[in-house]
Amino acid sequence: MRIEKDKELMNILKIMAPGTPLREGLENILRAKTGGLLILGDSDQILKLVDGGFKINSEYSPSYVYELAKMDGSIVLSSDLKKILCANAQLIPDSSIPTFETGTRHRTADRVAKQTGAIVIAISQRRNIITVYKGGIKYVLRDSSIILARANQALQTLEKYVAVLDRVVNNLNILEFKDIATLFDVVTAVQRSEMVMRIVSEIERYICELGNEGRLIDMQLSELIKSVEEDGILLIRDYCRSNMEYEDIYKQIQGLSSEELLNLDGLSKIIGYTGVPLVDTLISPRGYRMINKIPRIPSNVIENLVANFNQLKCVMEASYEQLDNVEGIGEARAKAIKNGLRRLREQIMLDKV
């Protein structure tokens, strides 16, 4: 459900993450301080720009790439990264393509990437950095230790944000069962949920860039967030105006800037409440989020329940017979729903104490 930002960049980072044969070859060139220019792709459009060099047509290996980079020209790899096609080749892109790069190697890489849409990697001999180009994208690969430090810092921040979200949601749970939740409580929970998901997106990018070195970070992340996004979406479904699509609302919230996300009035407008006081407006949940917490209740049954009763309070007050009349709910499921909601309420009230 998250909008896939920088999807192309994420795919590039996966290809050359630490632990991959390509990254190993790049690191070898970097350590040797020879510099290098690699193009990933063997389409006719790319091969038309290749002039001279040696036809290698050999299986890819990090050590082969390292040895071939000692020559001045560029190295052309196949699209699947399984073969080295040629080495010591000269790339001749269209010189009218604008570029703001300075070094010859980087100017060529930028132009070839813009002209062909292929991934081109320039390794600087003096600055000792790896720069990746694709279309209009330019990205400097960072050392794993730097990314790891940033990922750990982001995890610590996430931990604090999740703790605040838990407090806000637990408070909302109590208010929902008492049917005294206000627009302020709801919008605060939506805001906090989105804040957490933004940090998660940042950590996921670090994990992608770390490759096999990011496994522990990934495990810690999974443990921390569990069902945060799902609960956030159900929260929107519980409280948005009935004539609005919850998916569109979720996308709108994701599109907000950091400053806009801090504006609770703006968030309340997005979920359909315009010109009403946040603290004084009482709203009742439909029950999607709470009923979802009851085990073994299918989503179609939850949809039918909400369509029939429209409010969590009405579901809780309904008799076994009234629940039984809902499509997909028999006597056993009616008991499971009643008992499940009762246990949930008791648990939430105990947590408060």
Swiss-Prot record:
Residues 6-144 form the DAC domain. It comes from the Bacteria. ATP binds at residues 73, 91, 104-108. PROSITE patterns: DAC. InterPro entries: DisA, DisA_sf, DNA_integrity_DisA_N_sf, DNA_integrity_scan_DisA_link, DNA_integrity_scan_DisA_N, DNA_integrity_scanning_protein, RuvA_2-like. Keywords: ATP-binding, DNA damage, DNA repair, DNA-binding, Magnesium, Nucleotide-binding, Nucleotidyltransferase, Transferase. The keyword Lipoprotein does not apply. Its EC number is 2.7.7.85. One of its GO terms (molecular function) is adenylate cyclase activity. It is an enzyme of class 2 (transferase). Its cofactor is Mg(2+). It catalyses: 2 ATP = 3',3'-c-di-AMP + 2 diphosphate. One of its GO terms (biological process) is DNA repair. Participates in a DNA-damage check-point that is active prior to asymmetric division when DNA is damaged. DisA forms globular foci that rapidly scan along the chromosomes during sporulation, searching for lesions. When a lesion is present, DisA pauses at the lesion site. This triggers a cellular response that culminates in a temporary block in sporulation initiation. Homooctamer. Belongs to the DisA family. HAMAP family: DisA (MF_01438). This is DNA integrity scanning protein DisA. The gene is disA.
